[in-house]
């Protein structure tokens, strides 16, 4: 599983979360009085990059400290109503640790709910598949299992049907048994990813 990281990196991620929340609050306050109703219809797509913190555990190996690295998100789907969108979301994380490439990901069926027609804030949740892989040369440790996601975001309009959309997402995966070069390795593996991603969306 992942090696132990420094608490400084976790503090940096916490600072990014606070900054994203403050920016969202400020945008909401400015827009509440004069923002026009938002229109969601048909096909939509969005994606972007950011930063994330991963923690993991398994039976007999305990829990690791968080590791921070580059993170990304891609989502697409259709419109159920002006305030409810359905889609598929892929959340990923990557870091090279001492020559070993570590990747974490979730692929989920997701729902996005806008509590208000005139505000860009939305909540999201979904379920699907989670995966982990660590690779160094020909050696590979990997595992796959059930995954869940949850989070929130805010659409800041930049055009008729486009928006700048910062998002905070928490993903969880129950990977079960890990495999090392095809042979059973650690059991009871679980992982979480907390990410802040800055995306562009087209509705």
Protein language model features and the residues they cover:
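Cleavable N-terminal export/targeting peptides
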Residues: 1-39
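Outer-membrane pore/translocation modules
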Residues: 33-68, 173-177, 181-203
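Gram-negative (and chloroplast) outer-membrane scaffold detector with strong preference
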Residues: 32-34, 51-55, 70-168, 172, ...
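Short, aromatic- and cysteine-enriched interfacial helices/patches
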Residues: 2-4, 61-62, 156-158, 172
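Intrinsically disordered, low-complexity regions
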Residues: 19, 138, 175-177
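A generic structural signal for short, solvent-exposed coil/turn residues
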Residues: 17, 23, 37-39, 78, ...
């Amino acid at each position: 599983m992942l090696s132990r990281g420094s608490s400084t990196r976790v503090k940096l991620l916490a600072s990014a979360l606070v900054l994203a929340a403050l920016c969202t609050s400020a945008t909401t306050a400015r827009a509440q009085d004069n923002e026009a109703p938002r229109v969601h219809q048909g096909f939509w797509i969005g994606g972007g990059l950011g930063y994330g913190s991963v923690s993991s555990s398994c039976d007999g190996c305990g829990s690791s400290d968080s590791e921070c690295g580059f993170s990304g998100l891609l989502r697409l789907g259709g419109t159920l109503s002006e305030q409810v969108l359905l889609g598929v979301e892929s959340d990923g994380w990557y870091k090279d640790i001492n020559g070993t490439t570590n990747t974490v990901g979730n692929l989920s069926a997701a729902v996005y709910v806008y509590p208000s027609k005139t505000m860009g804030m939305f909540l999201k949740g979904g379920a699907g598949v989670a995966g982990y892989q660590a690779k160094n040369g020909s050696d590979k440790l990997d595992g796959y299992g059930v995954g869940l996601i949850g989070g929130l975001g805010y659409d800041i309009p930049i055009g008729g049907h486009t928006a700048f959309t910062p998002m905070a997402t928490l993903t969880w995966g129950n990977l079960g048994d890990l495999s090392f070069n095809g042979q059973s390795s650690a059991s009871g593996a679980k992982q979480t990813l907390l990410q802040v991603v800055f995306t562009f969306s087209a509705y």
